Amino acid sequence: DAMMYKIEGEDLYLIGTSEHSMIGKFKDQILKKEQLPITMTSYSPCFRKEVGAHGIEERGIYRVHQFEKQEMIVLCEPEDSEAWYEKMWQYTVELFRSLDIPVRQLECCTGDLADLKYKSCDIEAWSPRQQKYFEVGSCSNLTDAQARRLGIRVKSDKGNYYLHTLNNTVLASTRALIALIEN
């Protein structure tokens, strides 16, 4: 709750990511194997409360309370999630490279992973002004953890099983703008 904007007097919040809304559409559903993979994208406003003080390099449009974000979501067979993970983060890298922006992909160590995440990486763009890379997106494989929490399963002759979910930030407007202007 410390990172989210709650609407007073309501049990409503402004979203920090569209991932929850998109995957939530499938809550408590049993899908057919033929429906997979389900690939979705969303362009939405995102709202974040930032906690704590940040350094001078995070002033301006780097860390803002409202921004636009393009996201990719995949619901897939468990055996396909690793391939989707690789494909998804590469889409973001290819987008930035097509704009002649130097980027790199960094795998997050397990100690830095948020709840439910099995694997995650950050996509970072080069900042000539700061002479260092900064985060412009991230990609995560939650394996079946999110599907278990939401009750999203796949129908099978051998019994129903949980699918895998993945998400990827393709473009966060303000950080992409910084990378574009500086490069």
Q: What function would you assign to each model-found segment?
A:
Residues D1-N183:
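TRNA-recognition modules of translation machinery and tRNA-sensing kinases, especially anticodon-binding
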